[in-house]
Swiss-Prot record:
NCBIfam families: PRK05610.1, uS17_bact. Keywords: Ribonucleoprotein, Ribosomal protein, RNA-binding, rRNA-binding. Part of the 30S ribosomal subunit. One of the primary rRNA binding proteins, it binds specifically to the 5'-end of 16S ribosomal RNA. This is Small ribosomal subunit protein uS17. GO terms for molecular function: rRNA binding; structural constituent of ribosome. It comes from Buchnera aphidicola subsp. Baizongia pistaciae (strain Bp).
């Protein structure tokens, strides 16, 4: 069976909410006219059931059903823990 959920990885920029975190996704887009690569950033609110991610962690997230008005992504795993404690 083909997995129908998209998966992305990004950095946690806020975890001050209960069971939620905000993840920043960075990507490069080629400008259509000038052909220069431009950095784009997307902030996504994710569901973190066990409050296990902390500020600065690199996490892997996947798309899921809408959990609230802003949350439709959930934490899959923490790829790299931040050095901050």
């Amino acid at each position: 069976m083909i997995d129908k959920f998209r998966t992305l990885s990004g950095q946690v920029i806020s975890n001050k909410m209960q069971k939620s975190a905000i993840v920043s996704i960075k990507r490069l887009i080629k400008h259509p006219l000038y052909k220069k690569f431009v950095k784009k950033t997307t902030k996504l609110c994710i569901h973190d059931e066990n409050n296990q991610c902390s500020f600065g962690d690199i996490v892997e997230i996947r798309e899921c059903r809408p959990i609230s008005k802003t949350k439709s992504w959930m934490l899959v795993r923490i790829s790299k823990k931040s050095l901050r404690s």
